[in-house]
Amino acid sequence: MLFRSLACEPLKNKKKPRVLVGGLGMGFTLKAAIDTLSAGAEVVVAELNPIVVKWCRGPIACLTGGVVDDPRVKVVVADVAAVIRRAALPGRGNRFDAIILDLYEGPYEGDRGRGAYLYGDAAIERSCAALKAGGVFAVWSEEPDKAFEKRLKAARFSVNRQRPGRGGRHAVYIARKTPGPQARES
């Protein structure tokens, strides 16, 4: 089963799931989410590059059936970390049932590297705060990363690592927000 399907599978029976997809790319992750989720779903896609959005609405729209124009989809040209930060603010009613990060750079950068703003301790805690109870935090990674798994568990996620596809080189983390007080919010 592909990462895209694994990420939304826990939400397939939810009537109105709210999902954040980090990165549009060619639209395949978005397409899989839309195909898995109910008609009442809302999928917010955060894409940094407006040209990518233009391509997905134009020359490569046929690859995904024009999924970016599905009425359940809202595309924002923004950094996914900023969208997560806003959703994590106390008192906000815009938390997500799932956050899916299918980005070029995965968590292998560690807590202090370039990816810390998405995969470091504080970022993971923000993602947890941006999720509803039982929410899913799904992350694609170039390879397994034990330190990332440890950071997920420290933020009170239950973690399921999969190795989908041929060869099993890449890792997919499906982390569920567990009940109870979460780690400190930043």
Region annotations inferred by a language model:
Residues 173-186:
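C-terminal lobe and adjacent flexible extensions of AdoMet/dcAdoMet transferase-like proteins
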Residues 1:
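S-adenosyl-L-methionine
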Residues 147:
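Conserved active-site alpha-helix within GNAT-family acetyltransferase domains
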Residues 135:
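Glycine-centered, phosphate/nucleic-acid-interacting loop/turn motifs that mediate DNA/RNA or nucleotide
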Residues 4-131, 139-142, 155, 160-168, ...:
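The AdoMet/dcAdoMet-binding core of the Class I SAM-like
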